[in-house]
């Protein structure tokens, strides 16, 4: 039997505990061998120290904020032990079969996976099952090394990264029955969203500055906790049941 790939779920975060605990829960429910996966969380919001004791979860709390998302990405990936890097954003959600979906779609010549069958969730409901672009991509650590690591950019860096990996070949657009979809791309009412912001330019503060200002405004209003924070993994909603019902209703309509 072929050995399953070691998958490092890479999560970078800044002041979004309410959604981070959903991402954490999503990792903990994975139906995947515990010795073949890990979750790496990098937190560079100095006003928070995130705490969660689990053998598969490692949290790095930093005293200074990275000036570039690309630097933060590289810091996180350098600390990943897996052959595969699964983007595990702090505001998205995965079903329990997600890591197994990665393993099933990854071939010897694969460099990157995109989810052609993904779940687009626009608060408060699932909107569609469709391709989700660069959300939840999975790439090999080897490919990351071969392209010179993550680009030292802010907004738009994910597009630069994927374009460089695509140039290597080995691109998989993973399709599966709707009932097997496992990655939720979450939108609507879930905080400051980098996606859709385009690339940074001199006409406005960069994405790091804008997000920091947004989190600070929430902290002042008492909506962002500070200090030592013991993470309690949980979903806000039964997303698995929501997906099941969505697929069932879609089938009955068709």
Indicate where each model-derived feature is located:
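Cell-envelope/extracellular polymer assembly enzymes that use nucleotide-activated donors
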Residues: 5-8, 38, 160
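Acidic donor-binding/catalytic loop of UDP-sugar-dependent glycosyltransferases
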Residues: 92-105
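Short, acidic, metal-binding catalytic loop of nucleotide-sugar glycosyltransferases
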Residues: 22-36
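Short beta-strand-to-loop element that shapes/binds the nucleotide-sugar donor at the catalytic cleft/hinge
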Residues: 113-127
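Glycine-rich, basic loop-to-helix element that forms the pyrophosphate-binding segment
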Residues: 63-80
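N-proximal low-complexity "stem/linker" segments adjacent to membrane-targeting elements
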Residues: 1-26
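Short aromatic/hydrophobic "clamp" motif used to bind/position activated sugar donors
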Residues: 85
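Acidic donor-binding loop at a coil-to-helix junction in glycosyltransferase catalytic cores
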Residues: 154-161
């Amino acid at each position: 039997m072929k050995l399953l790939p070691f998958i490092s779920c890479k999560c970078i975060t800044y002041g979004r505990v309410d959604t981070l605990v959903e991402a954490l829960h999503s990792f903990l429910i994975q139906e995947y061998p515990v010795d073949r996966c890990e979750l790496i969380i990098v937190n560079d919001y100095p006003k928070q120290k995130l705490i969660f004791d689990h053998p598969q979860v490692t949290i790095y709390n930093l005293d200074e904020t990275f000036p570039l998302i690309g630097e933060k990405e590289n810091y996180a990936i350098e600390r990943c032990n897996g052959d595969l890097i699964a983007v595990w954003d702090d505001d998205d959600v995965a079903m329990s079969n997600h890591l197994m979906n990665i393993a099933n779609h990854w071939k010897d010549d694969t460099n990157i996976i995109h989810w052609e069958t993904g779940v687009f969730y626009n608060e408060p409901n699932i909107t569609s099952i469709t391709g989700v672009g660069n959300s939840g991509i999975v790439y090999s650590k080897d490919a990351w090394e071969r392209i010179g690591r993550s680009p030292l950019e802010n907004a738009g860096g994910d597009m630069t990264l994927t374009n460089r990996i695509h140039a290597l070949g080995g691109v998989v657009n993973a399709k599966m029955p709707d009932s097997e979809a496992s990655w939720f791309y979450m939108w609507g009412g879930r905080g400051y969203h980098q996606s859709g912001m385009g690339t940074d330019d001199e006409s406005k503060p960069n994405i790091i500055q804008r997000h920091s200002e947004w989190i600070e405004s929430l902290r002042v209003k008492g909506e962002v906790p500070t200090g030592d924070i013991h993470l309690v993994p949980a979903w806000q909603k039964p997303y698995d049941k929501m997906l099941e019902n969505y697929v069932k209703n879609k089938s009955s309509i068709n």
